């Protein structure tokens, strides 16, 4: 049994790892690795606190969100705005620009949505050099990776937009550094949802898995690419390959936390799903003021927003069940990702500086 699995088993029997064990584990760990680019130290504050040198009230917008975080709701609101051309998930494998490939299916949980592809109607399939890897491979991209085809595709969408362009992504989480480097004049908005509700919402065709399920026994239906994301990202975050004995929610939470780190570092604005559905007019009004979307809060669709999908996690397990597993995941990330990885010199950090980050789970509970 390898070291990580020993820690997992031990953690299942105790709520936290003590400082003594912490020190002993660190002594057994390999030499500190170099963090992959994109995991920037956060001592300088959140990216949203730093002003970028372009007019965000007129600039194109890109939305980044985990699956089942309300991104379709936000996209629908923006789509209805007369001064906006809002593209739905450009990296979706259905290829919205290709009528023969995309089909006609619309998710019944996406209220008020008749199609996802109208904005793509002027784009010829022959003009896009589509790459299947965009959907599930190379999910992490540093700013140094060219990815010419992906760049050309996004540039094409921005250029084809009849109005101010908005691109709603669910596969940009770990590509944010690349995106911001390649498209420095595009504002980045992060939509965040409670990780518990977000995970439960991924069970669309099947009931949620048992509270005793593990990743190893495949006691759950993976409807939103959780395992494939873990496999791809484990090339950079080896911890994600050592999770067989954990509950599927814990894997979802780990990726959620890592996604949060990227967002905290790179985006210009964070919008909480819970605020959006509980206080839609105020929340959308603040978003509209920040990004110059005049009249967005007065769109008719705002009246149809409700908070029925908030805190559904309580029907699955009690708070202690979730807190125990989230605390264990936070500890594992601190031990094997954040605290154990040394920042590269080109980030201006001294040798031995450690990443410092805090969980923001409480903000959306």
Predicted segments with their positions:
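Hydrophobic/aromatic beta-strand patches that form the interior of the parallel beta-sheet core
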Residues: 61, 85, 187-189, 269-271
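Conserved phosphate-donor/acceptor-positioning beta-strand/loop module used by diverse small-molecule
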Residues: 168-170, 182-205
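Walker A (P-loop) phosphate-binding motif
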Residues: 54-80
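PAPS-dependent sulfation machinery
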Residues: 87-167, 215-240
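Short His-Asn-centered micro-motif
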Residues: 64-66, 166-172, 191-193, 273-274
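PAPS-dependent sulfotransferases, especially Golgi type II membrane carbohydrate sulfotransferases
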Residues: 1-61, 226-270, 276-365
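PAPS/PAP-binding and catalytic site of the sulfotransferase fold
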Residues: 70-84, 179-183, 201-203, 270-295
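Short, hinge-like loop/turn segments at secondary-structure boundaries
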Residues: 102-106, 205-209, 288-290
């Amino acid at each position: 049994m390898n070291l990580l699995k020993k820690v997992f088993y031990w953690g299942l029997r105790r709520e936290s790892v003590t400082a003594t064990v912490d020190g002993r584990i660190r002594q057994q760990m390999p030499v500190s690795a170099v963090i992959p680019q994109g995991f920037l130290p956060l001592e300088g504050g959140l990216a949203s606190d730093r002003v970028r040198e372009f007019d965000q009230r007129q600039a194109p917008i890109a939305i980044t969100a985990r699956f089942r975080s309300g991104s379709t709701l936000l996209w629908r609101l923006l789509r209805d705005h007369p001064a906006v051309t809002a593209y739905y998930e450009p990296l979706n494998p259905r290829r919205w620009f290709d009528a023969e490939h995309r089909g006609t299916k619309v998710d019944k949980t996406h209220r008020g949505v008749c199609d996802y592809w109208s904005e793509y109607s002027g784009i010829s399939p022959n003009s896009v050099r589509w790459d299947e890897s965009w959907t599930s491979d190379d999910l992490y991209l540093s700013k140094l990776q060219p990815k010419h085809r992906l760049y050309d595709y996004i540039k094409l969408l921005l250029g084809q937009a009849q109005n101010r362009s908005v691109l709603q992504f669910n596969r940009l989480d770990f590509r944010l550094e690349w995106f911001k480097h390649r498209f420095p004049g595009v504002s980045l908005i992060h939509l965040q949802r409670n990780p518990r509700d977000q995970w439960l919402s991924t069970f669309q065709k099947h009931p949620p898995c048992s509270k005793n399920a593990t990743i190893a026994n495949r006691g759950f239906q993976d409807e939103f690419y959780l395992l494939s994301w873990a496999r791809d990202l484990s090339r950079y975050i080896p911890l994600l390959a050592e999770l067989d004995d954990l509950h599927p929610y814990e894997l979802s939470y780990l990726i959620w936390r890592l996604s949060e780190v990227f967002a905290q570092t790179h985006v210009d604005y964070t919008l909480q799903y819970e605020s959006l559905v509980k206080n839609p007019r105020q929340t959308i009004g603040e978003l509209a003021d920040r990004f110059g979307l005049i009249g967005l809060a007065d769109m008719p669709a705002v009246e149809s927003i409700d908070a029925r999908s908030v805190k559904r996690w309580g029907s699955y397990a009690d708070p202690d069940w979730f807190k125990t597993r989230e605390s264990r995941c936070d500890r594992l990330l601190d031990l094997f990702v954040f605290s154990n990885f040394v920042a590269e010199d080109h980030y201006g950090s001294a040798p031995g500086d450690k990443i410092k980050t805090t969980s923001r789970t409480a903000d959306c509970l």
